[in-house]
Amino acid sequence: MRKKIVAGNWKMNTLPAEGVELAKEVAAGRKDVCDAVTMIVCPPFTHLYSVIETLKGANIAVGAQDCATEVKGAYTGEVSAEMIAALGCEYVILGHSERRQYYGETSETLNKKMARAYENNLKPIYCVGENLEEREAGRHFEVCKQQIEEVVFNLTEEQFESLVIAYEPVWAIGTGKTATAEQAEEIHAYIREVLRSKFGAKAEECPILYGGSCKPSNAGEIFSKENVDGGLIGGAALKAEDFLGIGKAF
């Protein structure tokens, strides 16, 4: 049985006090979401610690939104995987489309970040997906396959066991557009097929999250698909009621 996951990516939103308040609201409603669903929140670096402290004992994991390629040293402004892990983070988002688009992250960069994450026992949530131009050109399978082969295929079988994949239809993020449940299932099934070609039966255990515009009103339909194991949630994660509503959609 694959793990069911709802992960909230807060992006560059909330000030520390607001983040703590949001975490408290999510914690208060956690009891209404099935225990079998793994709930994760990923706040900005500035309030990772306070959110982790707030959520102690709440059965909600905390992740970071990124980590540095390097271990430590003269890298002004960077935050290392070791620092994140020392705070008590369990997960780290890597390869988000916004990092690829705005900060030029490449497979080379992401292989380094992936290595740092595993060195510090962080579980990566690795993002793949195509933009509108690539989708309209019919290249969505090709793009996702390349992003997996160039990074995920470098993992050992043991490392792969703790990996989470998030499929982001980049054309559906922040645009209000949503891939249909059928479109989501089609590409999730393909991603699992690609993983199977390298990792065999272990691919059946890898959670693949949908990272488009997911909300309580459409989550149930999307999550009902065989190869959709949850969601990497953006905007809806900033409202506790919506985030919890998505968690109840299984």
Tell where the protein language model's regions lie, with residue ranges:
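Active-site loop-to-helix "anion-binding N-cap" substructures in soluble metabolic enzymes
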Residues: 1-250
